[in-house]
Amino acid sequence: IKIKYLIEFVDENIKSSPITVIDKNVILKKFKEVEENINKRFFDKFVNILNLIEIKLNRMSDNISLPLGLCHGDLTFSNVLVQNEKIVLIDFLDSFIETPLQDIVKLRQDTSHLWSLNLIHKECDRTKIKIIMKFLDSYIEDYFSKYDFYREYYLIFQQINLLRIVPYAKDEKIVNYLLNELKKLGEK
């Protein structure tokens, strides 16, 4: 995948999206909704992380400035097809806040958190994939760090994004993976 094209797609959406002030309660409400949907069987594993995220949310400014506008909503590599050297995006998804930040979060779900590796059940060179993803993630991080909203809100959006997957996790391995990734984010 030519990551440059995906970055350009997101950046064009940022540039065409007006910076809009939203109430932090929109994010807090989504967090509470996600928290309530966590499988009771796994809930105890996530209590500390949930508490830390809630503290972080409560400390945020009441008004949050984000670009609101075009957003794919689920821009993971599994929703990107390459045909005749052109990128085709599939499986668009509504987001709780239509912001290009969500697309950065979803890209980094793959590059930083290696989500799509969980979906591969064939033999592959995981070490090589991890090296490539680390390179791509660094590129994405460096590129979007120029935006205040990215530096300010990426972590909390990524935490909510990963928590959102937990209710769908049936496998203990996936639950532990998500727990570890959330712990890493909490340390930043």
Predicted regions and their residues:
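An alpha-helical support segment within catalytic cores of ATP-dependent transferases
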Residues: 14-70, 145-146
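Acidic carboxylate-rich catalytic motifs and surrounding loops in phosphoryl-/glycosyl-chemistry enzymes
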Residues: 20-26, 150-159
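Short amphipathic alpha-helical segments and their helix-coil junctions
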Residues: 85-95, 137-149, 184-187
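Active-site activation/catalytic loop segments of kinase-like enzymes and analogous catalytic loops
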Residues: 102-144, 159-174
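Regulatory N- and C-terminal appendages and interdomain linkers associated
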Residues: 44-48, 87, 153-157, 163-188
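Active-site acidic catalytic loop and adjacent metal/ATP-binding pocket
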Residues: 55-102
